[in-house]
Amino acid sequence: MNIFEGNLVSEGLKFGIVVGRFNEFIGGKLLEGAIDGLKRHGVKEEDIDIAWVPGAFEIPLIAKKMAKSPKYDGVICLGAVIKGSTSHYDYVCSEVSKGIASVSLESGKPVIFGVLTTNTIEQAIERAGTKAGNKGYESAVSAIEMANLLNTIG
C-alpha cells in the first residue's frame, strides 16, 4: 500500500495570487496572510506574483491564465463576498466557487479557494486575521501542500 501526502517544504515553488479588489480591506488582509504563509514556509518573494482583479467574479479568469502558465506551481484565489439585501451574493458565490474548481481540474494544478463568503462584514474581518485566523494564510499552506502532493504522485 502506498500513502501519499504533501509536505510543507516549498523551496523552488512559485505561486500566483489573485485578489479581488471589491471589499479591498478584507482582500488586503487575506493577501498579507497568504504572503506570510508562503514566506514562512520558504517561498521567496520573487517567486510570488500578485494580480488584482475588480471583484470576486473576475478571479477565475485570471486564475485560469496563471494556472495555464508553466511558471506557477499553484494559484491562490482571495477575496470577500459579503451578503447584501439582494440575490446577487448567491450568484457571485456560486459562480466563483465553480469557476475556481473548474480551473483547478482543467489545469491539473492546485487552485485554492480562499474567497470568504460571509453574511456580515464582522464575519469577514474575523476570518481575515482576527479571532478566526487568517484564511489567506491557510490557503497559502494548502497551496504548498497540494503542489507537493501533486509532485509526489507525479
Curated annotation (Swiss-Prot):
Domain of life of the organism encoding this protein? Bacteria
Where are the membrane-spanning stretches? Answer: none
Q: Which UniProt keywords apply?
A: Riboflavin biosynthesis, Transferase
**Which Gene Ontology molecular-function terms are recorded?**
6,7-dimethyl-8-ribityllumazine synthase activity
EC number(s) on file: 2.5.1.78
Q: What class of enzyme is it?
A: transferase
| UniProt record, GO biological process | riboflavin biosynthetic process
GO CC: one term?
riboflavin synthase complex
At which positions is (2S)-2-hydroxy-3-oxobutyl phosphate bound?
85-86, 127
InterPro entries under this entry? LS, LS/RS, LS/RS_sf
Q: Which residues form the active site?
A: 88
Q: What is the catalytic activity of this protein?
A: (2S)-2-hydroxy-3-oxobutyl phosphate + 5-amino-6-(D-ribitylamino)uracil = 6,7-dimethyl-8-(1-D-ribityl)lumazine + phosphate + 2 H2O + H(+)
The entry's function note states: Catalyzes the formation of 6,7-dimethyl-8-ribityllumazine by condensation of 5-amino-6-(D-ribitylamino)uracil with 3,4-dihydroxy-2-butanone 4-phosphate. This is the penultimate step in the biosynthesis of riboflavin.
Q: Which PANTHER family match?
A: 6,7-DIMETHYL-8-RIBITYLLUMAZINE SYNTHASE (PTHR21058:SF0), 6,7-DIMETHYL-8-RIBITYLLUMAZINE SYNTHASE DMRL SYNTHASE LUMAZINE SYNTHASE (PTHR21058)
Give the family, as the similarity comment puts it. Belongs to the DMRL synthase family.
Give the protein's recorded name.
6,7-dimethyl-8-ribityllumazine synthase
